[in-house]
Amino acid sequence: MTGPDPRSAPRLAIRSVEPARPWFRPGRPASLLVEIEVDRSVLVSARLELLDLDQVVGSVSHRLRLRPGRTRRRFRIMLPTVPRHGYGLRLTLERGGAALACGTCAVEALAGWWESPRHAVLTDFRASRWMAATVRRFAPWHVTVVQFYDWMYRHYRYASPHDGTFRDALGRRVSPAAVREGVRSCHQSGIAALAYGSVYGAEREYVDAHPDERVFDEAGVPLSLGDTFFLTDLRPRSPWRRRLLREYAGACRDFGFDGVHMDTYGQPHHAVTADGTRFRFEDLYPGLIEEAAGRLASRAGRRVLFNCVAGYPLDAVARSPAAALYLELWPPAVRYRDVVAWIEHARRVGANRAIVIAAYISALRDSWAVPDQRPGAEEAVILLSSVIAAGGGYHQILAEDGRALVEGYYPAALALSQSSARELRSAWRFGARYLHLLSEPQLSPAPCDGIELRDAQGRPIPVSPQPDAGHVWLRAARTPKGLRVLSLVDLRDQRDDRWDAVRQRPATVTGWRIRLPGFRPPLVAMSPWTAHGEPAQLRAGRATSEGLAWTLPRFRRWLLAVERTH
């Protein structure tokens, strides 16, 4: 048995490269974790570069002695002081001036998770032994905040009165030790942990013991969700409101949560209390959010999110002190343009906060009975996430272990195939690297007038300023610094524009040319699924009275074109 030929180049591969946590503060060092595999002992040069678009804005170099097998290393590089900004990280390993391997990832410079709420959920709290590994698997997704869904004993009493594992109201087994381990693991990974906390009501045993805390419809029937959770009186100083706020505070104090996800149920919008008082929920929610945020603010960094179900009541709560705006979309908001319209509306009223869109793909659940529809259902997940990101929002779709949410009850989430999970993960990493170009709250819409797109044969390609089926959706914007940004989302092969439907996977396109009146060189373009999201400088053709024509790089599904700093 012989070893590798010492005269040949070593076989070396970068197996993983990712930030030690999803975000770091501007002006502080960022840490990068790398796993390298090599077939022999070798001395290499490692160069780590920090990239703003395609410009190197920081670089560090090291000499590494690698031994055979797998080696884990940590690198550090200083981030610029620019607030709320995304960067690429590129690690190159060289020997004798020749590159042996290269790996890339993204990192965000943030004041806190709420500036980039890349949201996911945990649903399984049966045992603590696998919790740390489960949380670590969120790292490649650049998740910044995790909601602990249905972690509590009851909706009216979060901590169990009994020691050890319990059954929740729907019969699921929950270990408080697993919940605590999950929170601890999130903190170790730099991820915020939010406790799910229902606003809407309590189980039957509670309202049977407190009948005056129920609310009713106009016919005097108690309002409930499937006769399981009963809506309760949320008026200021009501017993239920005081209890709810105590439970929120106790969850953060006793379990270490970083805040609470305040869940509502949308309909109904009105109710009658036991004493005959009529009220609108939208009149009560702003004060409740303010009270909850104030109660949790005893420790810096604690925040609340509030679920505007079907967008209700966004305008009423938009100025309340929630960490970000969170909207859960349901019919009649069934088209891509409805999703984008909600993002744009939230941007107008949201006081420069990030926007999370919870939108679930029931087509994925339905496809399990029709296996040949499964790829199209998974494409629906990826395409919707792309539309939301191109529109400036964050998609709430991810549960632990690469599962996608298919309905409002999160434990029903279903696993994506490895290839689809990889595609979706690439889109999320892309959103992290370019967050200041995609989800910057102060992006201003820009017109798409005069933009022309042609294929490699010179034929015109239909475009639309709305995400309409049969077209390439164009979304143009200006950054606060005045740079133009243009997203192109390819919907040409879709037969309709419903977001919760089996979708056709778009083909890779090459040789397209685009005319961009008013855009000035240098111009770069990038796609999540081309060259790991790395920008490519565009070649401009001859200038005409209609402006420059640019050749676009090969891409699939979504391309982002940006004016670089002049």
At which residue positions do the language-model features occur?
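Active-site-adjacent "subsite" loops/lids of carbohydrate-active enzymes
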Residues: 111-117, 123-128, 195-255
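C-terminal beta-strand-rich structural cap/linker in extracellular carbohydrate-active enzymes
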Residues: 543-566
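The substrate-binding groove and active-site-proximal loops of carbohydrate-active enzymes
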Residues: 116-129, 159-176, 226-243, 271-285, ...
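Active-site neighborhood of glycoside hydrolase catalytic domains
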Residues: 236-325, 329-352
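Aromatic/acidic polysaccharide-binding cleft in carbohydrate-active enzymes
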Residues: 264, 353-450
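Carbohydrate-binding surface patches
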Residues: 458-520, 557-561
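Aromatic-lined substrate-binding rim segments of carbohydrate-active enzymes
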Residues: 152-202, 276-285, 291, 295
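An acidic-aromatic substrate-binding cleft motif
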Residues: 101-154
